[in-house]
Amino acid sequence: MNFSNGSKSSTFTIAPSGSCIALPPQRGVATSKYAVHASCLQEYLDKEAWKDDTLIIDLRPVSEFSKSRIKGSVNLSLPATLIKRPAFSVARIISNLHDVDDKRDFQNWQEFSSILVCVPAWIANYVTNAEVIGEKFRKESYSGDFGILDLDYSKVSGKYPSVIDNSPVKSKLGALPSARPRLSYSAAQTAPISLSSEGSDYFSRPPPTPNVAGLSLNNFFCPLPENKDNKSSPFGSATVQTPCLHSVPDAFTNPDVATLYQKFLRLQSLEHQRLVSCSDRNSQWSTVDSLSNTSYKKNRYTDIVPYNCTRVHLKRTSPSELDYINASFIKTETSNYIACQGSISRSISDFWHMVWDNVENIGTIVMLGSLFEAGREMCTAYWPSNGIGDKQVYGDYCVKQISEENVDNSRFILRKFEIQNANFPSVKKVHHYQYPNWSDCNSPENVKSMVEFLKYVNNSHGSGNTIVHCSAGVGRTGTFIVLDTILRFPESKLSGFNPSVADSSDVVFQLVDHIRKQRMKMVQTFTQFKYVYDLIDSLQKSQVHFPVLT
């Protein structure tokens, strides 16, 4: 069977994506040079020792896979955001494979002569995910053949019923800790109150009863790091289960949390209404500029991209230059910002291009988080690596580090850079503020330190847009922008502040919705959303007068 070879001599090219992966699939025609005829399945299944020779990966949700599957296939149901992360290696892919027979050892995956992937639907989103998986195998020296079945599962099962196994999975998937995915917390799992909970204490839940029929994986964005010593649970020998809510911070016992959680769900619903039309070029919420064959490769995460209407356009010196960067202009009633993703290696020169275009004499960059978290790269270092006095050239831009100092007992770092454009004689200065102790999808642990950081950035006297980034440029970035804006509000705007007021009168709700209309998923998690209310409440209880920032 002739199809794409994954040896070092072959070249993998990630196909352009269609709609944003976070959305419901948009029907469109996808193509892939790695497509192989599904008719080859019977040929492989007829081989006497095919299980030792061929790996068939099914990308559908576990709940669907458990009902019906290609004979001998294994399931891989993970969010695109996780699959695309550079640090998510083949070893981690292999550790997340779910096998019905639970007998095969996939650790020697290099010995498979062929790897076939079956996608849930033959559209660009899923095909691109499959190609990313193939790219990871190739980079780790896989020398066999890699192919994507040219028919999605529903068409395979209809056209080639002889290769389908319809026997239900009674206890193979989901019932045992070893078969569960790495633990992650979604909003639903950590909801403050379960109104449908039975029993006298809804803050303590027993281990869930396995129910394969209703089992599905959450599209989580923050998986806990893999624990090499105990494959079944990142917490050691304890059974992986939904956590008892007694272990959740005391803030979750606040009666207002249920109200806030419902508000957050309404924000999510409003955003979903916008995102369903993002693949339509004529829509106000179109994101198609970010998913062309050239711009797509400059996105750190495939499901977090800018809207066409607010994206930053790099100033081009020739028509052939690409003007794309994963960044959005954000305007609030008090300030102007640029929210962008953490740089990847191929976009560093674009980042400095954006800085040059959008600051005047002194610019301000705010970096939230560290370069690496739990072994995963969150942002590529985009400044000189050898410290003070070192210079580094990124495309047309020469960046020199002037100074570096730890501030507020090393809670954050201030760096100062000089930038020079090869096409202009002038030099611009940039103040770079890094708040490293703020992890992905979470909120800062110290309210006082966060307020001091905001004040310090406010005193930078930079000109032009304040450039803010974390890793994806939405969660921590959006939270910072909301906090920076609210702390500039006058006292009258926050008078009688109460989370229980209607959404139309809630300044936090309205502000988050406002910036989400300019960049998707801003203030990404419920934890971050609640933190904004907590910070305002803390300041008011301390009788701090607004505006805190001027």
UniProtKB/Swiss-Prot annotation:
Enzyme nomenclature, EC number: 3.1.3.48
Q: Which CDD domains match?
A: PTP_fungal
Q: Which reaction does it catalyse?
A: O-phospho-L-tyrosyl-[protein] + H2O = L-tyrosyl-[protein] + phosphate
Q: Where in the cell is it found?
A: Cytoplasm
InterPro entries in the record: Prot-tyrosine_phosphatase-like, Protein-Tyr_Phosphatase, PTP_cat, Rhodanese-like_dom, Rhodanese-like_dom_sf, Tyr_Pase_AS, Tyr_Pase_cat, Tyr_Pase_dom
Quote one Gene Ontology molecular function term: MAP kinase tyrosine phosphatase activity
Question: Which residues are recorded with the post-translational modification Phosphoserine?
Answer: 318, 320
List where the protein spans the membrane: none
**Main role?**
Plays a role in inhibiting the onset of mitosis. Dephosphorylates sty1/spc1 and wis1/spc2/sty2.
User: What is the name attached to this protein's record?
Assistant: Tyrosine-protein phosphatase 1
Tell me what gene encodes this.
pyp1
